[in-house]
Amino acid sequence: MPVASARIRSGKVAATCTDVHRVRPSVPEAPHSGPWRGSVSTMKKLINAVDNVVTDALRGMAAAHPHELDIDLDQHIVYRRRPKEQGKVAIISGGGSGHEPLHGGFVGTGMLDAACAGEIFTSPVPDQVVAATSAVDRGAGVLHIVKNYTGDVMNFEMAAEIVDAESGIQVASVVTNDDVAVEDSLFTAGRRGVGVTVMVEKIAGAAAEQGRPLDEVAGIAARVNAAGRSMGMALTSCTVPANGKPSFDLPEGEMEIGIGIHGEPGRHREKIAPAAEIAERLVTPILAELTALTELDSAGADEGVIAMVNGMGATPLLELYLMYGEIARLLQDAGITVARNLVGNYITSLDMAGCSLTLVRADAELLSLWDAPVNTPGLRWGA
């Protein structure tokens, strides 16, 4: 299967259960000609065929990063091209496609060893997770980082059970659940896992890179999740290629506060306000929760927050920086130090216009792990 100069894995893990959703059907080659199968009247997208969007995107990712990534186009798994030696805890994550660079863009030194890509806004199947877990194990166990969506949690849990029964690989799991907009939704039991997932993958990945044991890496990941909260908003909805129309209707002049990353509408709708007021809508509920958190379980003192202003996919960087400026001002007024920050697209929702804010209370250890070298398509520093 030709993919530029990138090495492509192939083959599947044999199915050992009767769940028909466990095994991914074979994926055809991308067409080079022929009709574009989509609703031309309702959406415009740079795609070939709706059915092949994820495979085509992974093929392009392999061509763009031939020296960093090793991509299995059959299983839709992104692997770190040069894994560390035996004895390193491996970390995998995954979820529906459409949130790029999450998760595949965070595979590499200092973050993930593998990422499982589901179809757009659809959880990866257990067989993908089993294959990735078995492939990346270096004898020290594997950490699964899972966003709190029912399908993701169920399929990763099933995969861990299969791995335990078939190979005995030690697996730990951390479920992210940082979205303050909802306590429950159609997709979750409890809060949704959103922006803090990026922080968990970065900080836990640094701990694993240092050679720390599985229980310690998992404990650090859980600490980051517990210390983080997020809130998002949208100016427009997003369009899933297979649907051909926006996931919800948002009239001109209105915005949604508290949206999800799968095109879920927000918890309330209101007239579009100036950026300063929108920033306040995001900061206020997050700070209400962060100030209620107990002191972090670490030897260091609270060092402030790591702040991420994240674009939802169609928001210009100019506007994201403008929003960060307003948010930084509000945090300063509240007496909160921004120790580190990210501004850009890190966990998106296809072509949605809008942004989200994630704040993580950090201590000296978490900041040190945050600052550790990372070399992935989506995050790079110090490497």
What are these regions (language model features)?
Residues S5, S10-G11:
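Intrinsically disordered, low-complexity segments enriched in small polar residues
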Residues W36-I91, A364-L366, W370-A383:
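N-terminal amphipathic/basic leader segments beginning at the initiator methionine
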Residues K44, V89-G96, L112-A115, G141-G151, ...:
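Short glycine-rich or small-residue beta-strand-to-loop segments that form or flank ligand, phosphate
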Residues H99, F106-R138, L287:
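Glycine-rich oxoanion-binding loops at beta->alpha junctions
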Residues K245-L322:
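Glycine-rich phosphate/diphosphate-binding loops and the adjacent beta-loop-alpha structural elements
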Residues P285, T294-A383:
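C-terminal non-catalytic interaction/assembly regions of soluble proteins
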